[in-house]
A protein has these predicted regions:
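Cytosolic-side membrane-entry/anchor segment at the start of a transmembrane helix
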Residues: 1-18, 147
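Juxtamembrane loop-transmembrane helix junctions in multi-pass integral membrane proteins
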Residues: 2-9, 31-38, 72-89, 111-118
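Select subsegments of transmembrane alpha-helices in polytopic membrane proteins
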Residues: 10-18, 87-96
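Loop-to-helix transition at the N-terminal end of transmembrane alpha-helices
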Residues: 34-52
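Membrane-helix interface/capping segments
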Residues: 55-80
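Cytosolic juxtamembrane helix at the C-terminal end of the final transmembrane segment
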Residues: 61-66, 108-111, 135-147
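Alpha-helical transmembrane segments and their membrane-interface junctions
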Residues: 93-112
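Alpha-helical membrane-associated segments of multi-pass integral membrane proteins
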Residues: 96, 113-138
Length: 147
């Protein structure tokens, strides 16, 4: 597998997660349970953002691949691998902050408000998924070798 195939798989997986998140949010948004409503709002917002990132990332990847000349393929792939690995590790660190922020929200505003507890839980779940997603892909990218 080359870096371009890897990026296609990565963005496709993120898009699937985003569709799942938005679909799940529509099922729980109109719940009488405030906690579920807060969770639904977070799943919807994160799902939309993740979809945007996945679509944009896929488009950028295709454009970069089309610009690469066969004579520069190995060098371009090496640069892309290095760049994407760095982005994934940075995102993994940011995901920890999202999780901590969600926990903080649950333990502050969420103590007295089920809606805010749902918001916090939604951030923890979404941040947790992204942590494992980014970590897995950052670790997996090390197996890719430029052509």
């Amino acid at each position: 597998m080359n870096i371009w195939d890897f990026q296609t798989r990565l963005t496709r997986r993120l898009l699937i997660w985003s569709v799942f998140s938005v679909a799940l949010s529509t099922l729980t948004f109109f719940s009488a349970n405030s906690l579920l409503r807060g969770l639904a709002i977070q799943f919807c917002v994160w799902g939309i953002i993740d979809a945007g990132i996945a679509i944009f990332g896929a488009q950028v990847s295709v454009k970069k691949r089309l610009k690469v000349q066969e004579t520069d393929l190995a060098e371009s792939e090496a640069k892309e691998i290095h760049w994407l690995e760095r982005v994934l590790w940075i995102n993994t660190a940011l995901d920890v902050l999202y999780i901590l922020g969600g926990l903080w929200l649950m333990q502050t505003k969420g103590v007295e408000s089920p809606l805010w507890r749902g918001h916090g839980l939604g951030v923890v779940i979404q941040g947790g998924f992204l942590f494992f997603f980014d970590f897995f892909h950052a670790f997996s990218i090390r197996n890719i070798r430029p052509s």
